[in-house]
Structures are given as structure tokens and as C-alpha cells.
Amino acid sequence: MRIKKMFVGLKNVILNPKKSVKMWRATVMWKRAVAEADKKRSMDGHRYFVIWDAAQHKLISITYDIYKGRGDSYQYLRARGAFKRPLSREELKELCFYYTGSQWRAKGCSAEVREEKLIEWQKFYLKQKV
């Protein structure tokens, strides 16, 4: 079974190399953004969400908590027009591509959810013209 998956993956790389490169790039971007969110979370304990920033063409990690003058706060980005409508934490959790736990015992992504979010991100990134 594992050999069959390997051959299917190899066939996809040979037949569609541009898509494979873009898929690899998407995976690397996601892993870096997840590592950044986990690092920020370990530093201050806040919950972070990984979202797509269309202006910068990259994944960024933001927190929902209010910070004065910090660019990675949802409230700060909302005030500057990055979001069209107000979002609750649960809505942001559904829209993001990864989320961490918090110091107040809010749970982060489980292994299954992480896998789903990665696949969701890859599909989203393949549709982007970057």
C-alpha cells in the first residue's frame, strides 16, 4: 500500500511538476507559519490563529487579544480594514488554517484537525495566483 502511494505521488510529480512545486511551497509556508504561531504562543501564552494575508501574500499568525500598536492583533488589523466584518473567536477559528492553545486551557489543533487544516490550506493556495 505504501509503495502504491509512493508511485502515485511520483506519477503526479512527473505529470504536473508546476502543481507539485506549488504544493511543496504551500506545505513549507504552512509549516513555517505554524512554527511561528507556536513560538509566539510559548512566549506570551495567548492563542494564535494562522491566516492568509492577501496584502503580503503570505501566512501570518495573529491573536484575538487586544494589543496597543501590535500588528499581529486581530483588533489592530480589523481597525485598519483587513477584515470586512467583525468575527468572533469561533468564526476566526473556522476560517484560519491553524490555531494554537492558550494559557487559559483553550485547546489547540489536534492531529486530525491539523491534517485537515493543512489540506484546506493547500487547496486554497493552489487556487491563488501567487
Q: What are these regions, as identified by a protein language model?
A:
Residues 25-46, 87-96, 114:
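A short, charged, amphipathic alpha-helix used as a generic interaction element across diverse proteins
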Residues 4-32:
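Basic, mixed-charge low-complexity alpha-helical segments
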Residues 105-130:
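Low-complexity intrinsically disordered segments
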